[in-house]
Amino acid sequence: MSNPTRGLQREITLRLGARLVQEGNRLHYLADRASITGKFSDIECRKLDETFPHFILQMESMLTTGELSPHHAHCVTLYHNDLTCEADTLGSCGYVYIAIYPTQR
């Protein structure tokens, strides 16, 4: 049985995809709702560990301001520490779908 791909579907072979649970303006990461496509190097894994909380804070702020809305699909793109995070609620009223990958230059 193959593992399902989680998060936003992108044509990028190295990415972390996840479905975050939204509770008000807070986001919760559940490991069983995430998947990795490709293989991150040790350095990329450290960057991801360092950067992930920053992306969560930015997305929570966007939920507060309405830039990310649980009622309307709208993709936002965030950049930090040579990583890109795309996020969208897809109008799901309870989830934020993400894809995080190395920034393409």
From Swiss-Prot:
Disruption phenotype: Single deletion has no effect on expression of cognate toxin ykfI i.e. the probable operon is not autoregulatory. Deletion of 3 type IV antitoxin genes (cbeA, yafW, yfjZ) has no effect on cell growth. Induction: Expressed in mid-log phase at considerably lower levels than antitoxin relB. It comes from Escherichia coli (strain K12). GO terms for biological process: positive regulation of cytoskeleton organization. Keywords: Toxin-antitoxin system. The keyword Metal-binding does not apply. This is Antitoxin YafW. Antitoxin component of a type IV toxin-antitoxin (TA) system. Antitoxin that counteracts the effect of cognate toxin YkfI. It does not seem to bind to the cognate toxin but instead induces toxin loss by an unknown mechanism. Co-overexpression of toxin YkfI and antitoxin YafW leads to formation of elongated cells. Belongs to the CbeA/YafW/YfjZ antitoxin family. Encoded in prophage CP4-6. The keyword Kinase does not apply.
